[in-house]
């Protein structure tokens, strides 16, 4: 029951309040800082819980007055208000009880790759990347292209970007997976609809403290950068490929003229990929995580279809269909499907709290 989850939180909050006024804690900066942070983390839940307990107590008292000739009607009216307040507060508390994702406020690496569909897939990589960039502008985020591999028709075989801004991961973490597009290519004279697919990966930016790589586990190869059609971009071995031997995860980087800069970029993306792989492994072992996530985030999972002839966007994970595809893509109005995904994840998590 909800009340059983709240009692220890309130007890701990009151205990910390008492400790923070003690001489021993006030004279210990480290302990004072730790306790103050812990109290701050649970303050909203504790205060709402105390209000909730008070409402429950008032409900009991008013129910006892229902048979009273003089106060019965008044108690009945007050019960309606109390039950309504109780229901509202329960929903607020359940939201507060959802475990915070430690990555939610981090910057992200956005990686989009063309899959099946040839040139059309590459064109859609560009279209979706532009939509993400427009969305980032609306959120006041910054987008920095780390690496891009353009095709010959104005799209990309692959693009990797660093998206910087508060809440970037929390908003975009459900974008990982396979995105399918259905539309008539400009070169299609018969008007036939082609289906192609691209993959998106969302990886939180990590620092050295969060993921530690043993240099002995890395294989570093250098080679000459290659341009379109295989021509050499420069005559020095500036391109870098770093392979993490234990996992086989590999990152190549050749956008910079400096080998050192390419190596630095490749290492940052490698760390993000290793961290992502670690998160996926943890989620696979954690039953609660499996219940609360919206899809697996796995690149092989088809999460969304963009049907241009019907102006239709469908998210298969939550059964959401919108008939405003062009407006959403061109305007960067991705909250049209991002917000329902977040709401669904919260609903799933709240359901777990009730169990």
From Swiss-Prot:
This is Peptide chain release factor 1. Keywords: Cytoplasm, Methylation, Protein biosynthesis. GO terms for cellular component: cytoplasm. The gene is prfA. It comes from Helicobacter hepaticus (strain ATCC 51449 / 3B1). Peptide chain release factor 1 directs the termination of translation in response to the peptide chain termination codons UAG and UAA. Belongs to the prokaryotic/mitochondrial release factor family. NCBIfam families: prfA (TIGR00019), PRK00591.1 (NF001859). The lineage of its organism: Bacteria, Pseudomonadati, Campylobacterota, Epsilonproteobacteria, Campylobacterales. Methylated by PrmC. Methylation increases the termination efficiency of RF1.
């Amino acid at each position: 029951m909800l009340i059983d989850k709240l009692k220890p939180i309130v007890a701990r909050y009151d205990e910390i309040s008492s400790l923070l006024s003690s001489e021993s804690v006030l004279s210990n900066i480290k302990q004072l800082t730790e306790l103050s942070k812990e109290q701050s983390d649970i303050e909203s839940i504790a205060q709402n819980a105390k209000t909730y307990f008070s409402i429950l107590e008032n409900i009991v008292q008013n129910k006892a007055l229902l048979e009273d000739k003089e106060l019965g009607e008044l108690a009945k009216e007050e019960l309606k208000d109390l039950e309504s307040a109780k229901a509202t507060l329960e929903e607020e508390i359940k939201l507060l009880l959802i475990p915070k994702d430690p990555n939610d406020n981090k910057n992200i690496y956005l990686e989009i790759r063309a899959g099946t569909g040839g040139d059309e897939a590459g064109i859609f990589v560009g279209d979706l990347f532009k939509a993400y960039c427009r969305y980032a502008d609306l959120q006041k985020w910054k987008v920095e292209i780390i690496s891009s591999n353009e095709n010959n028709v104005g799209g990309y075989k692959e693009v990797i970007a660093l998206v910087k801004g508060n809440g970037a991961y929390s908003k975009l973490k459900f974008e990982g997976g396979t995105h399918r597009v259905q539309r008539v290519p400009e070169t299609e004279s018969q008007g036939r609809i082609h289906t192609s697919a691209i993959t998106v990966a969302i990886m939180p930016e990590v620092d050295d403290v969060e993921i530690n790589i043993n240099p002995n586990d890395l294989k570093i190869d250098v080679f000459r950068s290659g341009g379109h059609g295989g021509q050499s971009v420069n005559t020095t071995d500036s391109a870098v490929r770093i392979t993490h031997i234990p996992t086989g995860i590999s990152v190549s980087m050749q956008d910079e003229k400096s080998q050192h800069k390419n190596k630095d970029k490749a290492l940052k993306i490698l760390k993000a990929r290793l961290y992502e792989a670690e998160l996926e492994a943890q989620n696979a072992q954690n039953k609660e995580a499996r219940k609360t996530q919206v899809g697996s985030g796995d690149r092989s999972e088809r999460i969304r279809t963009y049907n241009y002839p019907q102006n239709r966007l469908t998210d298969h994970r939550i059964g959401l269909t919108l008939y405003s595809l062009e407006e959403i893509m061109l305007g960067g109005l991705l909250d049209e499907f991002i917000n329902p995904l977040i709401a669904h994840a919260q609903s799933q998590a709240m359901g777990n709290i009730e169990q």
